[in-house]
């Protein structure tokens, strides 16, 4: 299985006025639609452990305190096809129990259905990581999957 889990199974995006955001166990992805023809020099992006700010052509698009902490040194942004800015943030808490319910503390919350789908996806990703010989990319999950699902780590092998 060479492709990452999210490439095989898809992502659960949360739509916003400027684009969308989604998450994996380890990262949060922010995709911002910008005017076609935007150049990298038109973009100002500030990434800190708990804050993000993005302006394009002097117009503020996104600014605020993140839902949870990230590793500031590992955050990156790219301009893709001169029409989309992709920001990738690395979570400090990288487990299925750490499902972000919103991008910022007070904005861009996922609705309850999307939150549920995000939690299911992170739990399946956790199972994939714990059982690399199996392919969970097309699996469905029900039952106890909130907060990362059941903990089997202390069962006898």
Swiss-Prot record:
Source organism superkingdom: Eukaryota
Pfam families attached to this UniProt entry: CS
Modified residues (Phosphoserine): 142
Keyword Cytoplasm: yes
Positions of post-translational Phosphotyrosine modification: 145
PTM annotation (N-acetylserine): residues: 2
GO molecular function: unfolded protein binding
GO annotation, biological process: protein folding
Keyword Cytoplasm among record annotations: yes
Ranges where the CS domain occurs: 14-104
Gene Ontology terms: cellular component: centrosome; cytoplasm; cytosol; intercellular bridge; kinetochore; microtubule cytoskeleton; mitotic spindle; spindle pole
Region (Disordered): 134-157
Compartments reported by the entry: Chromosome, Centromere, Kinetochore; Cytoplasm, Cytoskeleton, Microtubule organizing center, Centrosome; Cytoplasm, Cytoskeleton, Spindle pole
UniProt keyword terms in alphabetical order: Acetylation, Centromere, Chromosome, Cytoplasm, Cytoskeleton, Kinetochore, Phosphoprotein
Job description of the protein: May regulate the LIS1/dynein pathway by stabilizing LIS1 with Hsp90 chaperone.
Subunit structure: Interacts with LIS1.
Entry protein name: NudC domain-containing protein 2
Lineage: Eukaryota, Metazoa, Chordata, Craniata, Vertebrata
Gene symbol of the encoding locus: NUDCD2
């Amino acid at each position: 299985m060479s492709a990452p889990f999210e490439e095989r199974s898809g992502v659960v995006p949360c739509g916003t006025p400027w684009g969308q955001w989604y998450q994996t166990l380890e990262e949060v992805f922010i995709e911002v639609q910008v005017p076609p023809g935007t150049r990298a020099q038109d973009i100002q992006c500030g990434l800190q452990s708990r804050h993000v700010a993005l302006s394009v052509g002097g117009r503020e698009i996104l600014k605020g305190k993140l839902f949870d902490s990230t590793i500031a040194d590992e955050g990156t942004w790219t301009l893709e096809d001169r029409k989309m800015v992709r920001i990738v943030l690395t979570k400090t808490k990288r487990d299925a129990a750490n499902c972000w319910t919103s991008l910022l503390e007070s904005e861009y919350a996922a609705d309850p259905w999307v939150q549920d789908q995000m939690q299911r996806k992170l739990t399946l990703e956790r199972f994939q990581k714990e059982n690399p010989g199996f392919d969970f990319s097309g699996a469905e999950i029900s039952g106890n999957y909130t907060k990362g699902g059941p903990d089997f780590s202390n069962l006898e092998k």
